[in-house]
């Protein structure tokens, strides 16, 4: 026996058979051990051959295991020594002769199996005969498997049934009803059929953006081939999808990948046009299997493609086609491009209507038609970085999954009731141990309350179970209906018209009627929602994008109508600005905003400290309940010409290309937010050129060529231009003249095309002395919040309020000096008192003003007088 004459798999099986004999304690290495490992093989080559030869591989395996169990076992010193049985030596000899006779260079698995069946004296041969296997039938099965090929390499078995291993039969999947229906796309399917019908270079490649339905077109072609809805040249063809991952996986040695691919191509060529090969992600062919000196997959395909022996359909994206396929001109010319564009909104609605039944059956919930329309329109508007119909299908799928999860979960009403029952039962057990009259009286009341709750809970549980069962019944009926429709289609193809008639006019209408009855009995007051509606779709969109597109609740409508009042509580004395921002938000939430522009773009002009940035923070807190939920870009960081790249990302070839831009990345991650460009006049003029597209079209292309959507953002720019005019404006003077002076400066600094795109330019007036009291209240509310954890309560009387307002008012600097006054006059003394222990946690501190100083609980603090800075330590430190 020359081991080198055996293929790698046969060597592996012989080694496994020897290990089995040693493990079982058998002294002889018999043909039974070989038969056992051959039948245990996960790929099932030997088992498949036995079944094809008319035998029963499972029965033979069971009989082999029983025979091995009866073999004598050796333990002790003689264990572990295995001798070759004469029958095994005969089997190896017969296998080598059979291989030589067939012209094989190597002994393969099937030759070894044939040798076992030829030896009628061995127990393995007798078991094969009893199992219905004859050498003649087995030889015929081997020849059918080999298709005239000889074993010329140590991995020859990899070439057997290559298409079964490395491809998926789409026509069979269509026959089994595993493919989703394909709606529309008639033009693309017709163009694909036209290219396939050519004499040479009959290989279409479907090129389109990800998610537009390239693979679906091929599945549609498989369904058409199955239904005979194709020209004569394509009738009865098989459409197989090549699995590149399976081809490459496990190919350890050089040449193994090429051998597998060549085996696939040989089978396709041998079919003489009967097989069309579909290669999804076709760009993976270029460079696949490439190693030093080896050919890649695309070079192996080229000759067969050029001769027209290989019918092939490719599919890839525009970017990948340009990057990989177009560079290889010899490969590109062998394929005929078929461009697949994104379907229109109307076409996508039709596609979703065709898929609806499959998704209803899978999730066990009903999907309303309004939900399908909402999925298409909302995904088209708000999910801009993906393509129809993929994003609309994903929306429908997730909304249905979310509803199904709610149906399977206990309703909130029942859940809270059950939790209350558990709480009362714990209390009941505790009261049972008490003997005082009060506890006994409470126990009687509690038991009555508990009995009532348990009765209500039982009724609700029963009602919930009934509703769940109804949905479950509908799902089962829909699954049954789907199976019957597949059976009907197959019966019509086979010409079994009697069975087709029974199904079409009997069982199918009967099931449809039952489903209609269940759905007609929907209860408006049901505990669980039974259908996916447009609002469910809107909720999913809101989760994905952060854009509040779901239906406004009454509370939110009320909140929007009172927006000025809410923002006015934080921003004092700037009603014009607050009103302009509020109307923009209301317009957007009511759906009256131009869908191709940002929600609003404002330029806030005014002196420092009057509330420009504060209004933006208040707006972010109002919209998102978090004042940090905004992109704040300090434009003083963008004073150089090259700093524009930091906003949108560096172009290709520059350092930081992969990192993305400050502005574009923030909006891509969170499309619904406030964007604040602080101190915009300090930026380089070229920065404004970048903003032109954002303000006008609501979009911006970043350094990597991706389009970022700004249509759901609110853009605020702040500037101090012309603030000196506003500061020096006498009280009561007409603001019109001052506005004209300020606008003159703005026009001199910014270009007309930039200013023309801003929705509103709003002037912030300097703060009046009368408004300082309200600002004191706002600042004090923040200080009180800081002391909440210590339970220290501050009580500020009117005198102290007026004192702080007087000291903190400065027309040139707005409200910021007030913050410093509160810090020095209130926070600093208070901090000392807390550290000294004169103010403890939970204390009440009354703050007043007497004799021109603030008092704390009637006493002036050490630091009541604010000393001017002289460069020397304060007097109190010298005392």
UniProtKB/Swiss-Prot annotation:
CDD domains: AAA (cd00009), RecA-like_ClpB_Hsp104-like (cd19499)
Keywords in alphabetical order: ATP-binding, Chaperone, Coiled coil, Cytoplasm, Nucleotide-binding, Repeat, Stress response
GO annotation terms (biological process): cellular response to heat; protein refolding
Residue ranges annotated for the Clp R domain, each copy included: 3-148
GO molecular function: ATP binding; ATP hydrolysis activity
Subcellular location: Cytoplasm
Record region (Disordered): 858-879
Location of region: NBD2: 556-766
Record family assignment: Belongs to the ClpA/ClpB family.
Protein name: Chaperone protein ClpB
